Amino acid sequence: MVVERFKNSDAAAVYRRFQDKGRMAPEGLLYVSSWVDDKLERCYQLMETADRSLLDEWMANWSDLVEFEVYPVITSKEAAERIAAGAGAERKPA
């Protein structure tokens, strides 16, 4: 999950560049979806890649307009599987 904060609260500059140049994501970095807060100050974007350097490359293309925070995330299903696997290992026989 990528949290983008538009510098100077200038979402318009970000959207202008997007219209002119597209997402500018390198091959191997997949855009999934995004949500923008109603104040047009932050974007919460889900990207997917096995190679963190591709994410860094993409962020460098936007770093003059956007500040980034990156949070590795997994699906709820994956979280449940991890928890179940851990809980199963901790159970003691009766």
Feature names for model-found ranges:
Residues 59:
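Short, flexible helix/strand-to-coil boundary loops that buttress conserved ligand/catalytic motifs
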Residues 65-77:
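Conserved short beta-strand edge segments in small beta-sheet-based binding/regulatory domains
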